[in-house]
Amino acid sequence: MSTLYLDDEMMGYKDIFLQAIQDIEDLGYRFKPILLIHSYMGRSKKILGVTYWYHDDTCLIEFSVDNHNIHVYDYGIHSITGIQLSISTIYHELAHATVECHFKGHGKEFKKLRNKILETYKIDIGGAVSDYN
């Protein structure tokens, strides 16, 4: 089990992160002892998340909340009130953070994990050709 550190903006997603980490570990995958998760703003309009692997016991995952297209709509005031991370992006970056999938991009092991997540949890994490496409 890893120690999870979230910045203030990511705290609203803590239950999703904890569940996703547990789900991936239940499939037989491992994480580094320290997972740092925080948000970043505007380095790229295309990047939803990025995972950095360090030579110590640390893995850093950054999420760009602003680049996600899942909008929170407030029907009381009839306006978009915020943007949320998608669950599939959370699982996608956590898949890259596993010991088994890191440094291999969207290769064979990532594809295997994607298929397991899709089959078990019905979440398509994207990024690799799936047997279900």
Regions found by a protein language model. Name each.
Residues E93:
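Walker B catalytic acidic pair
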